[in-house]
Swiss-Prot record:
It comes from the Archaea. This is DNA repair and recombination protein RadA. PANTHER family: MEIOTIC RECOMBINATION PROTEIN DMC1_LIM15 HOMOLOG, RECA/RAD51/RADA DNA STRAND-PAIRING FAMILY MEMBER. One of its GO terms (molecular function) is damaged DNA binding.
Length: 398
């Protein structure tokens, strides 16, 4: 039985009346209960905190028993085994895939920040295509939910990228669910009600572009900073919970600002402060690199080393540079050349085998002649005497 299809009424203490309250509040499954949590559940359903805590606890235990979510306590081996189910979505470029260790990871938030024109939205459009590729081609064969807060989603761009990847544009567009957010409250609401759509549409990637734009424009001045961060934190936590409970990836773009107290180095800083920084699993910095090139740098990661990758924007969306492709071709030819070389024998084996072209098998000695005792001239004398005596010559010596 699929855990995602467990009915809410299967839970102890959830009758028809409670079930209706939950569904009216946008809670349709046990996963939704775990994602929301007891505090938020009480706010949206008007149920008492005791009932909410009881329902969420029962749902969490039920899901943990079936292996849908991690138990409260688990060994390192269990966590390692669970992480084997984590998927990777290719970025469409060898350089970025190598930088990220295979691509965008599920059950995690990958934050991409950078100034305008650095390629963030183009990257999002590219991921709309690569996510829907089959697993053998680096995708997950699932849909995409695109939360558009700036009105920058362009289906025409998806069509161009799809054609460049030899994929059906119409089918790809049908696999993208776009939600246009007009204010920060609407942005949070979209995510709160996303659970049912994620299950029904087999969503494997959630794109939030941009994550902080609406919060930044609505909450101005230091006096509103606390309220903004509290609301933004709730949105980011929802993203993290959804990514883990539904085993999907989250790609969140972020705006930047300049730090006035930075006298050396790059003054560019991502917006959102520690609230966004602590919630993001991976932080990638996009910057312009001259002409059509862009540079991606890992700023924060639990296991990736700090490194950079160069890519460019083109017909395929984000793509490898010509220099990188030439380098890959050069390395491939070198590998083929090395594989074609004959295997060299070790000195010991070569000595045992003897010189090349010479039979190393010991020669058969003439029968009846002690070559070890006789000198070369003695052997010649013996042969001569045998011939003079009228005896047939040994055929081995002729």
């Amino acid at each position: 039985m699929n855990i995602e299809n467990f009915d809410l009424s299967d839970l102890e203490g959830v009758g028809p009346v409670t079930k209706k309250k939950l569904e009216d509040s946008g809670v349709h499954s046990m996963m939704d209960l775990v994602v929301r949590g007891p505090v938020e559940l009480g706010e949206i359903s008007s149920m008492s905190s005791e009932i909410c805590e009881k329902i969420v606890t029962i749902a969490r235990k039920r899901l943990a028993e079936t292996g849908a979510i991690t138990k409260d306590f688990a060994s390192g081996s269990e966590i390692y085994k669970r992480r084997q189910s984590i998927g990777m979505i290719t970025t469409g470029t060898d350089a970025l895939d190598a930088l990220l260790g295979g691509g965008i990871e599920t059950q995690a938030i990958t934050e991409v920040f950078g100034e305008f024109g650095s390629g963030k939205t183009q990257f999002c459009h590219t991921m709309c295509v690569t996510t829907q590729k089959p697993k053998e081609e680096g995708g997950l064969g699932g849909g995409v939910m695109y939360i558009d807060t700036e009105g920058t989603f362009r289906p025409e761009r998806v069509v161009t990228i799809a054609k460049a990847n030899n994929m059906d544009p119409a089918k790809l567009l049908d696999g993208i669910i776009v939600a246009r957010a007009y204010n920060s409250s609407h942005q949070v609401l979209i995510l709160e009600e996303a659970g049912k759509t994620i299950q029904e549409e087999n969503i494997k990637l959630i794109i939030s572009d941009s994550t902080t734009g609406l919060f930044r424009s609505e909450y101005l001045g230091r006096g509103t900073l606390a309220s903004r961060q509290q609301k933004l934190g709730r949105y980011i936590r929802l993203l993290a919970r959804i990514a883990e409970t539904y085993n999907c990836a989250v790609l969140a773009t972020n705006q930047v600002s300049s730090s006035p107290d930075s006298f050396f180095g790059d003054p560019t800083r991502p917006v959102g402060g520690n609230v966004v920084g602590h919630a993001s699993t991976y932080r990638i910095y996009f910057r312009k690199g001259g002409k059509n090139k862009r540079v991606a740098k890992i700023i924060d990661s639990p296991h990736h080393p700090a490194s950079e990758a160069v890519f460019e924007l083109g017909e395929r969306g984000v793509q490898d540079t010509e220099e990188h492709l030439k380098q890959l071709d050069k390395e491939a030819k070198k590998a083929e050349k090395e594989a074609a070389k004959p295997v060299k024998k070790s000195k010991a084996k070569a000595k045992a085998d003897g010189p090349e072209g010479v039979d190393a098998t010991p020669a058969i000695e003439p029968e009846g002649i002690d070559t070890a005792a006789a000198e070369p001239e003695d052997i010649g004398t013996i042969v001569s005497e045998s011939a003079d005596a009228g005896e047939p010559a040994d055929p081995e010596l002729e």
